Amino acid sequence: MKFIRAELHNHSTESDGALSVESLAAYAAKKNFGVLALTDHNTTSGHAKAYDAIRRAGYALALLPGVEITTFFGHILALGLVQMPDITTLDPRAPEPFFAMLRTAGARAVGIAHPFSVGSPLFIGWRF
């Protein structure tokens, strides 16, 4: 079995992160990560920049596209998404259609972004 270092929850300056996507990719490569998930809040705008930065620099780093989506039920990580789905038409009290939409949009893994930041009903929105 081969061990691959992966960082699966990262924000860049495309949302509330401190590093640009280029700097984030450089940092992950320097720390010998094999996989970097870019999961900015409610946007996939940094994915193309990150792919380009990784390619141009020749990093041995795979980019896993994703997004951290803010919902009434909390912050949800959706890995594998290349585009942010339009969730504005969904009933905020019904999570099942939301998760079905993520599957249809290409999410391969979905999870709670901050499992220990419990609020009401499960979490409450943005906290930064």
Residue ranges and their predicted role:
Residues M1-A109, A113, G119-F128:
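A metal-dependent hydrolase metal-coordination microenvironment
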